């Protein structure tokens, strides 16, 4: 490193003791000394060669600067007397009294000339004060002590806020972190402004006041009282101000009856029946949770979905309850009435890719698992009055909290009723209780015999037999469209649209395959207790009106073949050429003759009874989809053809086959 005159001059000055401090302000204090000779700085050159680091030296009462023996006219740090110019004013000063030194070169001269002197001016280089000097100043001037206490309070608050901000969770969002940092920065600016204003208290320029909504601690209040005592004649915060601020911060805001009612309603929604029954179905803590987008066609934003996370094995009815809970908690618009906060009032439907409701697909089976449908987007729609009545009868749910009604004064309000009306009301209540009473029905599973298995289902008298069949097939992992119900020990097949109250007593039911029913073709009648809900006519009518059978379809020339492309977005190719064949009751998806190396020769045969939906796309008429129920789950097939007309023909043929098989079964 090259040693220049300027570097030697600066280093020589830093190794000197402070002397000749002028009595000016902090920013204008000047330190003067005589410049050393160039030839006498060999020791300084050696010091620079060894790279001496002054920044690592700890400060005590004065900077660690030792005067060089080669430098002349250098005074030790002690009380000095200095005569300022022609005025002859004598000033006493110490090196420790300097808060700042300056670093501005005001005058320069030839370093080699001994007669010339150099004056340096340094600005805002902080030096550490002696603790003894600070205590001495506070003892002589109580005002300084009070101001230092206020600064200490501000610094303590700032330290606490910084420590609390460091404890913020690292996984919080970026916006949350920015808000917390801005809050800390705002509080810091407020405290620094209070600290800066405190320096002007001695001049009476700024009154010391605290906002009325701020919360003062005991230490802060004592500091305000101390400042008021120091400056009694000027406009300051008085004891009454502190006491008033304390009373305002400790007092409770008045609460109106309307606000209390709204808070009670909000707490009721968070702790109501929805939260009690469906909050446990959240899949937020599970890795394999169902992550769905739920659309609300009746809301103000029907195209904006609500993201929910559900457990993997949740049922459709349970998913509806949890979705309603999230709708209420997030306060979406319009709000749902208390009576409608009931899963029986709603249905879950499948939507298109753009979120529009798929009108061709019916409401999802409430007793089945939601995961079997294989979709990630659904729509929550209002059920019809008939569906609400049916769901409420099968699965009663109370959507309201029991409200406390003041009891009437029997002494002043007496209601006379006749014996006839009271008796009729009692009979109606007994009938209602009987219908709502739960029963356990036994369903025998094939194969039948002495070692036959049974499945117990808890139902009510108003439960439809279709719900019983759905629940049995769900519990035993069976395909619902292949089975039906009959009374045990008979060949009478039960219509699934009737209720359990249409049966006499509590008979044992049997689960039977539909093909067995078709072979026997029984039309036996079942005795019932209610003529209105009798199943005689329905069974005989179905047997007489059913002119289709499986042999007619199989014997007819119904084989058709179409060239389609199966769309697979996840695949490397994007789409694969396939042959879609309609043969009897089955739809076959076969590989085409022009196979490539990425395809495997695999044929999928789908029964028409397992096809849930077949629909042509509205946005892309050349595309159509087919949804199939298989092994308690649903699978979706997306196909593409050359023209919209060909897609319409395929969809119409598959739908006709679905209707034919449905009439037979």
UniProtKB/Swiss-Prot annotation:
Residue ranges of domain SIN1-type PH in the record: 558-659
Protein name: Target of rapamycin complex 2 subunit sin1
Pfam families: CRIM, SIN1, SIN1_PH, UBL_AVO1
Top-level taxonomy: Eukaryota, Fungi, Dikarya, Ascomycota, Taphrinomycotina
Residue numbers of Phosphoserine PTMs: 62, 133, 404, 490, 502, 530
Keyword Phosphoprotein: yes
Keywords: Cell cycle, Meiosis, Phosphoprotein, Stress response
Free-text note on domains in this protein's UniProt record: The CRIM domain forms a ubiquitin-like fold with a characteristic acidic loop, which recognizes and binds AGC protein kinase family members substrates.
Gene: sin1
Region (Disordered): 65-112, 395-433, 517-537
Record-level GO cellular component terms: cytoplasm; cytosol; plasma membrane; TORC2 complex
